A protein has these predicted regions:
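Phosphate/pyrophosphate-binding active-site segments
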Residues: 2-4, 11-12, 166-169, 207, ...
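Glycine-rich beta-strand-to-loop/alpha-helix junction loops that act as flexible
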Residues: 245-247, 311, 428, 479-482
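N-terminal alpha/beta PP-like core and its mobile active-site loop of ThDP/TPP-dependent enzymes
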Residues: 2-371, 410, 414, 500-503, ...
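Short amphipathic alpha-helical interaction patches enriched in hydrophobic/aromatic residues
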Residues: 159-162, 392-395, 556
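Thiamine diphosphate
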Residues: 132-146, 292, 341-342, 350, ...
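Short helix-loop-beta connector
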Residues: 90, 418-419, 471-472
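Conserved structured core elements
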Residues: 18, 22, 225, 252, ...
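Active-site diphosphate/adenylate-binding microenvironment
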Residues: 43-55, 59, 381-461, 466-467
């Protein structure tokens, strides 16, 4: 990250006296993108005694150029900030501040989510007094073995960069380091600057030049020629290659470069969850989602191909089918992060996706995949699109509750411009699997599914962040009852901010996805669906989700079937505020089309016969890794 200062030379030698908190806020407010926009779109804040006097005063002073947003839950507002950055393809971001104690530790889950997904967020939790004079203060964690420990140390494991500021002068080095990590393609992730209460209030004479408006330049590492030549040599020997596109293609602004590469060289493209949308859903070479939650077209090609070109993907188990899907193929990995580029013994190209694809295409020249391979990909892609149309447009039988595929179809039928106009937001349960298979995305950014950490509760908070980033788009949050009950308070925040969301809530009365996985592993239905849980004399309540949403200020309704859902979606699209639609769905009928084996360890010994049978199947699958691998649909799966 380079920062170009734009202040007059006469200001270079002057100083300005500010508190540490004022310095943080003023520095962040001065940063700009190359397009002249503020790098930081704002700060989410929940104030407490650990940050209200210091950061609260500083944020108020700069409330116009660096807006402050109040939320209802610290983890949720961090999710919103992360989603904001993802919606901006990591080119803009937000900061988050909390008090000490529970406010700070509520950030840990969100920080882990940002870390796993390689997404930037700046966390500014308050911390205990450096002076220790009033110890132990309210909410202070005391460690009898280490007097320097605070609850914020829990954030070290889930931060790309962590610093505790014990003197105001340390900000002169800590803040540039923080911005470097947040804007670096290889290191990108959460940054934590812990700000002790007394240090926030301390004044220091800072160089005025430190706060001059400056443009942040995002570092895009160029590929080494020898790495490009090794990758090109491997591809030239291939006849049946497949591209696997990850989030790095979108974050590297390489979607058009990817499309040009694929068509010039006749290589089909399979999508990960993070990479979906890099190629339009109806592009002839888009063979759909890959892996455990992928479609049959991509998985057939991955299992048959002789080379996989992985671009900007972490190659997690849902992409690789627990390392069984394309184990027969040679692997080329383009990734700005060397940790990811070296996975699976790949021929690594550590570089920005756009620059690497351009260089690789130039090195390949007129080389193309075998014509019959490209033709096969076209046919499989067309067949898969027909399958998607059939699955999403075939209504449930009489007396059947709808399933996820039915809901997805109704949502997209409610507006013919949905593939290019809507942004769908989701995170956990059965829905990400069906969305990867079935949602039609026409442009980059239209598919926002958090599937690195698969964090229940991200959905509504994430939707809020997306809407703040893309207010001109219709943001549709599709969420299950389980995730909604875990975290829903930012629906009220969306109403307060005028950041309209459409929330489609599928109520299958419990954790339906894990219930199916439990039974697939031989377990009895237990503690997942509400009916299978321990209950008191009054039984489980019947939850009126529409009424709950209304209590938070949203408009809402409950619908009885798919036709009513499609009509309700049109009312929601026309509404002037957040709108929730709830619908009862079947917990037992997932989309069977597509899919691949996923390794979930089954108990080696059990008194339950079904577990013994499941263990035998699991061992067969493990043994198969040395030869044939499990085929589509052999093992029901979900996150």
């Amino acid at each position: 990250m380079n920062q170009r200062a734009t202040q007059p030379e006469t200001e270079l030698s002057s100083t300005v006296r500010l508190t540490a908190a004022q310095a943080v806020v003023r520095y962040l407010a001065a940063l700009r993108t190359e397009h002249g926009e503020p790098l930081f779109g704002g700060v989410f804040a929940i104030f407490g005694h650990g940050n209200v006097a210091g950061l609260g005063e500083a944020l108020y002073r700069h409330r116009d150029e660096l807006p402050t947003y109040r939320a209802h839950n610290e983890q949720a507002m961090a999710h919103s900030a992360i989603a904001y950055a993802k919606a901006h393809m990591r080119r803009r971001m937000m900061a988050v501040t909390t008090s000490i104690g529970p406010g700070a530790t509520n950030l840990v889950t969100a920080a882990a989510l940002a870390h796993v997904n390689r997404l930037p967020v700046l966390l500014l939790p308050g911390d205990i007094f450096v002076s220790r004079a009033p110890d132990p203060v309210l909410q202070q964690l005391e460690d009898s073995h280490n007097g320097g420990v605070s609850a914020n140390d829990a954030l070290k494991a889930v931060s790309r960069y962590f610093d505790r500021i014990v003197h105001p002068a340390q900000l002169l080095s800590a803040l540039p380091r923080a911005i470097r990590v947040l804007t670096d393609a290889a290191q990108c992730g959460p940054v934590t600057l812990a700000l002790p209460q007394d240090v926030q209030a301390m004044a220091f004479d800072y160089p005025a030049s430190f706060f001059a408006p400056r443009v942040v330049e995002f570092h895009a590492p160029a590929p080494l020629p020898r790495e490009i030549e090794r990758a090109a040599a491997l591809l030239r020997d291939a006849r049946e290659p497949l591209i696997v596109t990850g989030g790095g293609v979108l974050y590297g602004q390489a979607a058009e470069t990817l499309r040009a590469f694929a068509h010039r060289h006749g290589v089909p493209v399979a999508e990960t969850q993070a990479g979906k949308g890099a190629l339009a859903w109806d592009d002839a070479l888009n063979v759909g989602g890959i892996g455990v939650t992928g479609g049959s077209a991509a998985n057939e090609l991955a299992h048959a191909g002789d080379c996989v070109l992985a671009v900007g993907t972490r190659l997690q188990d849902f992409t690789t089918g627990s390392n069984t899907l394309f184990k027969q193929a040679r692997l080329v990995a383009i990734n700005a992060n060397p940790f990811d580029a070296l996975k699976q013994d790949a021929v690594a190209v550590q570089a920005d996706a756009r620059l690497a694809l351009e260089a690789l295409s130039a090195a390949l020249g007129d080389w193309r995949a075998a014509p019959q391979w490209t033709t096969r990909a076209h046919r499989l892609a067309e067949d898969w699109r027909a399958t998607v149309a059939h699955v999403t447009n075939t209504p449930p039988d009489a007396g059947q509750l709808p399933r996820e595929a039915d809901v997805i179809g109704a949502v997209q039928r409610s507006d013919e411009a949905s593939p290019t106009g809507d942004i769908v937001v989701c995170a956990a349960g059965t829905l990400p699997a069906d969305l990867q298979k079935l949602w039609r995305t026409g442009a980059p950014g239209g598919y926002h599914v958090e599937y690195g950490y698969s964090c229940m509760g991200y959905e509504i908070a994430g939707g809020l962040g997306v809407k703040l980033a893309r207010p001109e788009r219709e943001v549709i949050v599709i969420v299950g009852d389980g995730s909604y009950l875990m975290m829903n308070s930012e629906l009220a925040t969306s109403v307060m901010l005028g950041a309209k969301l459409i929330v489609v809530l599928l109520d299958n009365r419990g954790f339906g996805c894990i219930n199916r996985l439990q039974q697939a592993c031989g377990g009895a239905p237990f503690n997942n669906l509400i009916d299978d849980c321990r209950q008191g004399a009054l039984g489980a309540p019947t939850i009126d989700f529409a009424m709950h949403a209304r209590s938070l200020g949203a408009l809402s309704e409950h619908v009885a079937n798919i036709d009513e859902l499609q009509a309700a979606m049109q009312r929601a699209r026309a509404a002037d505020r957040s709108y929730l639609i709830s619908i009862d769905t079947d917990p037992a009928r997932p989309t069977e089309e597509g899919g691949w084996w996923w390794e979930v360890a089954v108990p080696e010994v059990s008194e339950r016969a079904a577990v013994v049978v499941a263990r035998e199947a699991y061992e067969r699958a493990l043994n198969a890794r040395a030869g044939d691998v499990p085929k589509n649909g052999e093992d029901p799966t979900c996150p």
